[in-house]
From Swiss-Prot:
GO MF, one annotated term: 2 iron, 2 sulfur cluster binding
UniProt organism field: Shewanella oneidensis (strain ATCC 700550 / JCM 31522 / CIP 106686 / LMG 19005 / NCIMB 14063 / MR-1)
Protein name stated in the entry: Dihydroxy-acid dehydratase
Highest taxon above the source species: Bacteria
Family: Belongs to the IlvD/Edd family.
Subunit structure: Homodimer.
Cofactor note: Binds 1 [2Fe-2S] cluster per subunit. This cluster acts as a Lewis acid cofactor.
Sites bearing N6-carboxylysine, chain numbering: 124
Binding positions for Mg(2+) per the UniProt entry: 81, 123-124, 494
Catalytic-site annotation from UniProt: 520
Signal peptide: none
Gene: ilvD
Job description of the protein: Functions in the biosynthesis of branched-chain amino acids. Catalyzes the dehydration of (2R,3R)-2,3-dihydroxy-3-methylpentanoate (2,3-dihydroxy-3-methylvalerate) into 2-oxo-3-methylpentanoate (2-oxo-3-methylvalerate) and of (2R)-2,3-dihydroxy-3-methylbutanoate (2,3-dihydroxyisovalerate) into 2-oxo-3-methylbutanoate (2-oxoisovalerate), the penultimate precursor to L-isoleucine and L-valine, respectively.
EC number assigned by the record: 4.2.1.9
């Protein structure tokens, strides 16, 4: 049987000092020998998705201690991408993922914790904790803070649903009055929780369900609903059950690397494509797979993107549905159920919601609203919004009058009635992106699936914003924003402002945008990111010139710079002749701190998940 990791610091005469310190944290004589469960919280008053998490660790701890464990909580940092957006703060967002992963590893290994509960919610926090959990490979359960309620307001006597992106677009649209813009701003983010659409935070929290590492409802149950309390309590109970299975029964199926196996990554990708998740999820799934030592790559994502239909359309791809509507339709388990019936899901994989010996098939039998016989489960998925602004968790217990089980015209569709037979994400490749790039097809208008235009090149997001707002960009342009990749930014900024401003100027369907940076989960339109190799790594995107013809063909999965090989070779020679200034932006003024320079030294391009280049760290 595996020995408790915590025994290293709690057993033997030579650990008297460590035990004395444990006692000072509240550990009693009869507690020694119990498993120590780390609770990685991410409470902060900076982030609406985390502002309500302060007491969540205590909830989880109470369940752990009742089940016979010792619970010890610590905190990680959490960056709000929306607040950091549009200025130098965004350089820190993606690098914070690595810091979060490292900080969880540091705390868990320094104190020899036996298992882990991750309380996450927003964009880089869930991926960072996921990377750490798979790196550590000790029993783990994820439980997030939950989504925000959708905003609602009246404009021209019409009630509309809103989210963060609506506020940004309205503010940049000169046709929207100051009064209406302010009204939208005040209504867009009414409660605590992760932003209400299928943006990065909610996408990742949904994916933890598909990976098998969080409980049903984790990705969709509203932060404000009282039913979410039970998810935190059950996370504590479940992690103790997993801990006992591993340490007392030598059941390695309780470990995260055996749960989040290759098949589980395929399941998560199928879900991602079916629900039109944020393109950032590709980055984070690739990074998590490397930590899990699973050989899951962009090629696998490309392969699956050609097989999986688009079954669930949510804001920002449509104003009709938000996460509260996804939950009413059955949440992640509802989408997985449709994927299973379409023959696109592995159900023989372990899941933290399954009892010992169980698997995803048994979880779906209970939690898929289209097949369950459990009325409590149906009531669970009828939990709805209250429409009352608040920063408090569990502050309401409203319910929808009925489930949305309309698989023909509802929020979640069956394969037969899919929003499209093409999935919500696609991998494109060609001479402009030899190692691939990503487009969220769920947000692309059908008229733009094939697009040919002239390059309008910018060396930074700031210059692109100035060009768009200043009228340089016109219909038919392909806006190219380069040197914003993991190494070149550094930090791979999100390009939500450029895409929002294109929309506000009426160019959302008339232009394309290509970048080696990334996009907010709130982005829609013909926005192609993660171009690899990035400009700073010698990618072709660095060689594009104004006026070059760029050809995009999403159905054919291709992206081409219509310049001859000989011309490109000549441009590459010219670039290399710049010596130390080769593959660096011309004329860009940007302060890059030592912390960001350290990140850039080890960063890989997006096709590798923008993780550290391990070859530079090997002995």
């Amino acid at each position: 049987m595996p020995k408790l990791r915590s025994a290293t610091s709690t057993e033997g005469r030579n650990m008297a000092g460590a035990r004395a310190l444990w006692r000072a944290t509240g550990v009693k004589d009869n507690d020694f020998g119990k498993p120590i469960i780390a609770i990685a919280n991410s409470f902060t008053q900076f982030v609406p998705g985390h502002v309500h998490l302060k007491d969540m660790g205590s909830l989880v701890a109470s369940a752990i201690e009742e089940a016979g464990g010792i619970a010890k909580e610590f905190n990680t940092i959490a960056v709000d991408d929306g607040i950091a957006m549009g200025h130098g703060g965004m350089l820190y967002s993606l690098p914070s993922r690595e810091l979060i992963a490292d900080s969880v590893e540091y705390m868990v290994n320094a104190h020899c914790a036996d298992a882990l509960v991750c309380i996450s919610n927003c964009d880089k926090i869930t991926p960072g904790m996921l990377m750490a959990a798979l790196r550590l490979n000790i029993p783990v359960v994820f439980v997030s803070g939950g989504p925000m309620e959708a905003g609602k307001t009246k404009l021209s006597d019409k009630l509309i649903k809103l989210d963060l992106v609506d506020a940004m677009v309205a503010a940049a649209d000169s046709s929207v009055s100051d009064e209406d813009s302010a009204k939208i701003e005040r209504s867009a983010c009414p409660t605590c929780g992760s932003c209400s659409g299928m943006f990065t935070a909610n996408s990742m929290n949904c994916l933890t369900e598909a990976l098998g590492l969080s409980l049903p409802g984790n990705g969709s149950m509203l932060a404000t609903h009282s039913d979410r309390r039970e998810l935190f309590l059950e996370a504590g109970r479940r992690v103790m059950a997993l801990t006992k299975r591993y340490y007392e029964q030598d059941d390695t199926s309780a470990l995260p690397r055996n749960i989040a196996c290759f098949k589980a990554f395929e399941n998560a990708t199928a879900l991602d494509i079916a629900m039109g998740g944020s393109s950032n999820t590709v980055l984070h799934l690739l990074a998590a797979a490397q930590e899990a030592e699973v050989a899951f790559t962009m090629d696998d994502i490309d392969r699956m993107s050609r097989l999986v239909p688009h079954l669930c359309k949510v804001a920002p791809s449509t104003p009709k549905y938000h996460m509260e509507d996804v939950h009413r339709a059955g949440g992640v388990m509802g989408i997985l159920g449709e994927l299973d019936r379409a023959g696109l899901l592995h159900t023989d994989v372990p899941h933290v919601a399954a009892d010992a010996g169980g698997n995803l098939k048994s979880v779906l039998a209970k939690y898929d609203v289209m097949q369950t016989q459990d009325d409590n489960v149906k009531q669970f998925f009828m939990a709805g919004p209250a429409g009352i602004p608040t920063t408090k968790a569990f502050s309401q217990d409203c319910r929808w009058p009925s489930l949305d089980d309309d698989r023909r015209e509802g929020c979640i569709r069956s394969r037969e009635f899919a929003f499209s037979q093409e999935g919500g994400l696609a991998v494109l490749s060609g001479n402009l992106a030899e190692n691939g790039c990503i487009v969220k097809t769920a947000g692309v208008d059908e008229s733009n699936l094939i697009f040919v235009g002239s390059a309008r090149v910018y060396e930074s997001q700031d210059d692109a914003v100035a060009g768009i707002l200043g009228g340089e960009v016109v219909a038919g342009d392909v806006v190219v924003i380069r040197y914003e990749g993991p190494k070149g930014g550094p930090g791979m900024q999100e390009m939500l402002y450029p895409t929002s401003y294109l929309k506000s100027r009426g160019l959302g369907k008339a232009c394309a945008l290509i970048t080696d940076g990334r996009f907010s989960g709130g982005t829609s339109g013909l926005s192609i990111g993660h171009v690899s190799p990035e400009a700073a790594a010698g990618g072709t995107i660095a060689l594009i010139e104004n006026g070059d013809r760029i050809e995009i063909d999403i159905p054919a999965r291709s992206i081409k710079l219509a310049v001859s090989d000989a011309e490109l070779a000549g441009r590459r020679e010219t670039m290399l002749a710049r010596g130390p200034m080769a593959w660096k932006p011309v004329g860009r003024e940007r302060f890059v701190s030592m912390a960001l320079k350290a990140y850039a030294m080890l960063a890989t391009s997006a096709d590798k998940g923008a993780v550290r280049d391990r070859s530079k760290l090997e002995d």
